[in-house]
Structures are given as structure tokens and as C-alpha cells.
């Protein structure tokens, strides 16, 4: 009888520990989603403010050239839409999100120079760093002690100074930078929301 009680106690403690970990992971997931949503909103505001200050002829020029431009994230293999994202594993979505955020470590410093508001510039750098750290913890949680077999996570992106070496003029370069930042934050928000929704196992979870 005593042995049965001990075993029951061990099982209950284990369940409580696992529930605690699950709760912590869910809070972290919710936190990273909120952070990337804020970054996406910030990116949208920045590009709108930039556009509002353009001269009509500059706006017409950019409308013709920017759709043909590439972002450094185009070198990162990723789902092209929500449907494809929903078919990807949670770990894959987290890894791609990490890679996308990582691609802005250098570019965010360049991005900060295009923003006149120093508070906004600081917010970008801090939130990108926090987001990268949070996603890294979630990836480790998904691996659950298993080795990370995705060697591509540690490979440098091609053309790390991509946004510095383009032959665009300053106006086009700045607009491209803002447009790419908005596009990438939209991607990360989509991937993290899909991953979080899948993890919650909530049938009412909406994307």
C-alpha cells in the first residue's frame, strides 16, 4: 500500500511539472506572437510615414522599381502562404522564423538610420533581440533534449551586407529596406501564429 502511494505521488508530481512546463511554453509562445505583431505594426507605420513624405514623382518611380526588388530573405526557403505554412511542422516554422529574424541583425542597424525617431530605432533592435531569444527557447523545447540536426541554422546568410551594397539610390534603398522589413515581419507573424495555434490544440483557434 505504501509503495503504491509513493508511486502515485511520483506520478502526480511528474504531471504537475509537465503541466507547469506546458504553461510556461504557452506563455512564451503568446509573448513572441505579441512581439512580432508589434514589430509588424511598427514596420507598417514606418513605411507609411516614409511614403507620406515622398514627392509624387518619387512615389511613381518607387511603385515601378520596388515590385521588382529582392530581399535577403528571398534566399531563405520558407512557406509561400498560410496554406503551405499550415502543412509545415511546428519545428520547421520556428526554425524559419528564427532564420528570418537573424537575417535582420545587421540590417536592423541600417534600418535604424532611416528612422528619425530614436525611440523607434531602439524598439526595433530590442524587440528583434528578444524575439530571437524567445524563438530559440521554443526551438529547444520542441527538440526536447534531442540534438539539432538542422545545420543550416548556423550557416551565414549570403550577402550579409546585401542592403548596403545594392546599386539603388538612397531613396530606393531606404524604401526597399522598409518594404523588406515589413514583408519579413509579416512572414514571421504568420508562421508563429500558425505554430502557436497548432500547439494550443484549440479548435476555435483562428489565424
From Swiss-Prot:
Instruction: State the family it belongs to.
Output: Belongs to the somatotropin/prolactin family.
Q: Extract the Pfam families matched here.
A: Hormone_1
Quick one: where is this thing mainly located? secreted
Record protein name field: Somatotropin
Q: Does the keyword Signal apply?
A: yes
One GO BP annotation of this record: response to nutrient levels
Keyword tags: Disulfide bond, Hormone, Metal-binding, Secreted, Signal, Zinc
The record, for CDD domains, names: somatotropin_like
- What GO MF annotations does this protein's record show? growth hormone activity; growth hormone receptor binding; metal ion binding
Q: Which residues bind Zn(2+)?
A: 38, 189
Q: Which residues form the signal peptide?
A: 1-22
Chain's role? Growth hormone plays an important role in growth control and is involved in the regulation of several anabolic processes. Implicated as an osmoregulatory substance important for seawater adaptation.
Tell me the compartments it is located in: Secreted
User: What GO cellular-component annotations does this UniProt entry give?
Assistant: extracellular space
Q: Which cysteines are joined by disulfide bonds?
A: 71-180, 197-205
Where does this protein come from, organism-wise?
A: Labeo rohita (Indian major carp)
InterPro entries, alphabetized: 4_helix_cytokine-like_core, Somatotropin, Somatotropin/Prolactin, Somatotropin_CS
Amino acid at each position: 500500500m505504501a509503495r503504491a502511494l509513493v508511486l502515485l505521488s511520483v506520478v502526480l508530481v511528474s504531471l504537475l511539472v509537465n503541466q507547469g512546463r506546458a504553461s510556461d511554453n504557452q506563455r512564451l509562445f503568446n509573448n513572441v506572437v505579441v512581439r512580432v505583431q508589434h514589430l509588424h505594426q511598427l514596420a507598417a507605420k514606418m513605411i507609411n510615414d516614409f511614403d507620406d513624405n515622398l514627392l509624387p514623382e518619387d512615389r511613381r518611380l518607387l511603385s515601378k522599381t520596388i515590385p521588382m526588388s529582392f530581399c535577403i530573405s528571398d534566399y531563405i526557403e520558407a512557406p509561400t502562404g498560410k496554406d503551405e505554412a499550415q502543412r509545415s511542422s511546428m519545428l520547421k516554422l520556428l526554425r524559419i522564423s528564427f532564420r528570418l529574424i537573424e537575417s535582420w541583425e545587421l540590417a536592423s542597424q541600417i534600418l535604424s538610420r532611416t528612422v528619425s525617431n530614436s525611440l523607434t530605432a531602439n524598439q526595433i533592435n530590442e524587440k528583434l533581440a528578444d524575439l530571437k531569444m524567445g524563438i530559440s527557447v521554443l526551438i529547444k523545447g520542441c527538440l526536447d533534449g534531442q540534438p539539432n540536426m538542422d545545420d543550416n541554422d548556423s550557416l551565414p546568410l549570403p550577402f550579409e551586407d546585401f542592403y548596403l551594397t545594392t546599386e539603388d539610390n538612397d531613396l530606393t534603398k531606404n524604401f526597399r529596406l522598409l518594404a523588406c522589413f515589413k514583408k519579413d515581419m509579416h512572414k514571421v507573424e504568420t508562421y508563429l501564429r500558425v505554430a502557436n495555434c497548432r500547439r494550443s490544440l484549440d479548435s476555435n483557434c483562428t489565424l
